[in-house]
Amino acid sequence: KPTKLLKSNQINMSDKFKKIYDNSIKNPENFWQEASKDIFWFKKPTKILNKSNPPFYKWFEDGVTNTCYNALDVHVDQGNGKRTALIYDSPITGNKNNFTYEELRSKVSKFAGALKNQGVVKGDRVIIYMPMIPEAVVAMLACARIGAIHSVVFGGFASNELASRIDDSKAKVLVTASCGFEPGRTVEYKPLVDGAIKQANHKIDKMILFQRSGHEVKLNAPKEVSWDEVVSNAEEIDCVEMKSNEFAYILYTSGTTGTPKGIVRDIGGHIVALKWTMKNIYNINEGDIWWSASDIGWIVGHSYIVYAPLFKGCTTVLFEGKPVGTPDAGAFWKIISDYKVKSLFTAPTAFRAIKKEDPDGKFFSKYDLSKFESLFLAGERADPDTIKWAENLLKVPVIDHWWQTETSWAISSNCTGIEMMKTKYGSACKAVPGYDVKIIKSDKTIAKPNEMGDIVVKLPLPPGTFPTLWNADERYKQNYMSNYEGFYQTYDAGHIDEDGYICLLYTSDAADDYIR
């Protein structure tokens, strides 16, 4: 039975989306000032956009806030502390757990105290090399609570990759676990971390390791300490007030050679933009159940497992499993059914894997997905066959949208919370409010509809995008802003059709860099 959203796909659209989009492009400061009223500030910004030093733009420059406060404390303060913040489900281990906003704040405050006891102060870098467990989310939010800059590295990444990130970030502390689990095998983290520490020129002060049950490892005191031990000796601590343009995190892009490329996120713009996206792009409200099936080591995990859903006050699902093999091709349907998930965000690869294992959807028929309203795909090209297969099976809108590690949120999408637009197979829909997207041809002129070229975004980029690279302003300028003056180069090619729909030819490593 088609949902309300799917029915609206068949009707004539009003100009609601166009009005909002046009306003965001013509009056960006007013548009984002309005959005900024929806988050908590210790000191509200009066300077909305500083354009004095392009391409280094600053949003909400004089604002003072805190990422963790907006993710947790604000909801507890508003009387929603008993609402479920995080659902953890691990079909690999059989472990399940729910955490209310109150409980999660308590755990985060305690681990923030533990980090402080290990000498971590505002501005210090903390590397988080963890599997998909609640402690990984706790570590990220604890860093945000005290103003430390986290750098999450995908658990299981090779020692040399981890070493290069230790060296570039000059991290003070590394937080890890004894192991991660893949279907049919255990990935021992300690030897990988030990190898990285040995290879790195910069020496970390401490390693905090979470011992997974049945997979405990020996720690070498005093540099290596257990999670449980440091938490038992810690007190809960409050949020530190942070300037809007201080950094929330560094996320290194994968697959780079030489010095890793550290994408940074400024605090104020990050909170404002991500909270705005939950309702406007994904049609998710406070208390809704949201699931992003990605990994916290990638940008989708940062933005849509951890930060955006918690900023919005909804319930986010943390899934330690795979689309197939944990235990079967019904794993996703089971999660959606068990927790009454409203929307899922994942990569097309996941659905191709499910389709290959269960082309007729036999597993699907075992579960109740009556609360499920929409599926969002990103990270690589969503081929029309996969989209149509998912639409026919799920009977909900299947929305392909496009974004990058650099942007932290969608450049183009069907904005279901504003107005559902017609699907065009092979397109990632229209540019999202905030992004003035153009196609530039090889002769450096702006393309006409349906003409191919490089996809660029007119500067300034909206809040929540990367203001620079970690300790590499010149590289930021040269890599992204120099080929087309006044524009951000996405390094994707494509065309925009006569209706404003963006059609992409993805870069070869897009799936690696966006979603994994």
Label each region the model flagged.
Residues C68, L86-L141, A158, L162-A163, ...:
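Conserved AMP-binding/adenylate-forming core of the ANL superfamily
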Residues K82-T84, M207-F210, L219-Y252, T259, ...:
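Conserved pre-ATP/AMP-binding loop-to-beta segment of ANL
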Residues L141, R145-E229, P348:
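Structural core segment of the AMP-binding/adenylate-forming
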Residues T253, V456-S508:
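Conserved ATP-binding/catalytic segment of the ANL
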Residues I271-I289, I299-S343, K356-K362:
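Conserved AMP-binding/adenylation subdomain of ANL enzymes
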Residues C314, K342-T346, K355-K422, D436, ...:
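Gly/Ser/Thr-rich phosphate-binding loop
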Residues K438-L459, H495-D499:
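Conserved beta-loop-beta connector loops within the AMP-binding
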Residues Y506-R516:
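Single conserved hydrophobic/aromatic residue that forms the stacking wall/gate
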